């Protein structure tokens, strides 16, 4: 079966992370978020996967290659061009990306799945496909009910009692929302839908293709199915995704490394004296990291590979990226540390009394010389 992963966006809402990596490559429990999707698609028989890429495309293409490591075939549709030896990203919209692939080689010749490359799911895709076929719809959206106070964060789907979609609301206020069913970014299309998408034009699935499907009066269904859905739309979602997954709240996802103490996992060759530190799980400490005596770590916290936490540092409910150093005055809570950056869940820099974050750095630069 065939699927498409949408991976061409710039990820502006998760900056500054996406200055250095495309959004689908952001690590969750040490693994790119898109890798969870590829694994899940493979489990449900989707063995031919096209990925549209644009922003920092080589990072995605270089990591996933042709897909054989996951038992699938992966191909890429690059949205952009080369100018003066520099790659210029020019995304054409989510629906435009589908049209571009189809116009090039006619890839979509049967029912196909489209998923956003920035979410982790455990949805029974096989069951959802069956519901789509049974309904006879030309297009289906997988929806999920969310608490009413969360509705303004999503695109709302309004449907009748049979599941036929009637209208959409884009991030309505709590009072204006006509439904608590939201668009999860998981779509099933018949190839005929592609005829509605204009050629060589930036065209979006949610804001342009879906209204067109409604206008044409085509069978358009919402499929509600129970599943865990961790959407990484913004930095706060990314932080929450790590928190939830470290607590084991997504089926089929296991912590990497070795569980050396209850709810504490490590990679290889970690330097730590357990009698001289305070660590309360769930916590992961990456390979070749050094945790000095006097450090406090409270979970859920992820410490990446090659990190250096100096005596006196305190880390709580945070994500510390690979090769980060936190100095003795560093107190990090509900935050993300990477390079010389330390930001809260909203991407705001955490202030330092001295003005500069001299307690955050690259561990490879400031690691003390080996004795």
What are these regions (language model features)?
Residues 1-62, 72:
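N-terminal glycine-rich phosphate-binding loop and ensuing alpha1 helix
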Residues 111-113, 120, 126-133, 146-149, ...:
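Catalytic-core segments of class I nucleotidyltransferases/pyrophosphorylases
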Residues 341-371:
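Long terminal segments
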Residues 61, 69-161, 196:
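Conserved beta-loop-beta/alpha segment of the NTase-like Rossmann-fold superfamily
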Residues 25, 157-159, 222:
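A structural signal for short hydrophobic beta-strand segments in well-ordered beta-sheet cores
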Residues 215-300:
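Extended, small-residue-rich solenoid/repeat segments and analogous flexible loops
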Residues 50-54, 142-143, 336:
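Short internal beta-strands
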Residues 258, 264, 269-277, 283, ...:
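A structural motif detector for beta-strand N-caps
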């Amino acid at each position: 079966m065939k699927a498409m992963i949408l991976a061409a966006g710039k990820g502006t809402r998760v900056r500054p992370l996406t200055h250095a990596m495309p959004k689908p490559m952001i690590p969750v429990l040490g693994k790119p978020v898109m890798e969870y999707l590829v694994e899940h698609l493979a489990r449900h028989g989707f063995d031919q996967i096209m990925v549209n890429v644009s922003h920092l495309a080589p990072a995605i293409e270089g990591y996933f290659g042709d897909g054989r490591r996951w038992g699938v075939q992966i191909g890429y549709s690059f949205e952009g061009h080369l100018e003066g030896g520099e790659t210029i990203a020019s995304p054409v919209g989510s629906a435009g990306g589908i049209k571009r692939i189809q116009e090039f080689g006619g890839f979509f010749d049967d029912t196909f799945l489209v998923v956003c490359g920035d979410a982790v799911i455990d949805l029974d895709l096989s069951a959802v496909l069956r519901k789509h076929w049974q309904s006879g719809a030309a297009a289906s959206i997988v929806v999920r009910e969310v608490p009413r106070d969360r509705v303004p964060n999503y695109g709302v789907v309004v449907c009748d009692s049979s599941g036929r979609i009637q209208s959409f609301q884009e991030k309505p206020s709590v009072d204006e929302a006509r439904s608590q069913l939201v668009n999860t970014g998981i779509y099933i299309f018949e190839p005929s839908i592609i005829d509605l998408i204009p050629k060589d034009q930036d065209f979006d699935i949610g804001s342009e293709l879906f209204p067109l499907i409604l206008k044409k009066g085509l069978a358009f269904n919402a499929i509600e199915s129970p599943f865990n859905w961790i959407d990484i739309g913004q930095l706060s979602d990314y932080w929450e995704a790590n928190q939830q997954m470290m607590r084991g709240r997504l089926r089929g996802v296991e912590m990497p490394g070795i569980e050396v103490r209850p709810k504490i996992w490590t990679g290889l060759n970690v330097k730590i004296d357990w009698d001289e530190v305070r660590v309360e799980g769930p916590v992961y400490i990456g390979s070749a990291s050094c945790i000095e005596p006097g450090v406090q770590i409270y979970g859920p916290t992820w410490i990446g590979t090659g990190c250096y936490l100096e005596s006196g540092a305190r880390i709580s409910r945070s994500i510390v990226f690979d090769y980060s150093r936190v100095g003795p005055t560093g107190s990090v809570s509900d935050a993300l540390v990477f390079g010389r950056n330390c930001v809260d869940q909203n991407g705001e820099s955490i202030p330092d009394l001295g003005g500069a974050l001299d307690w955050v750095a690259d561990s490879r630069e400031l690691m003390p010389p080996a004795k």
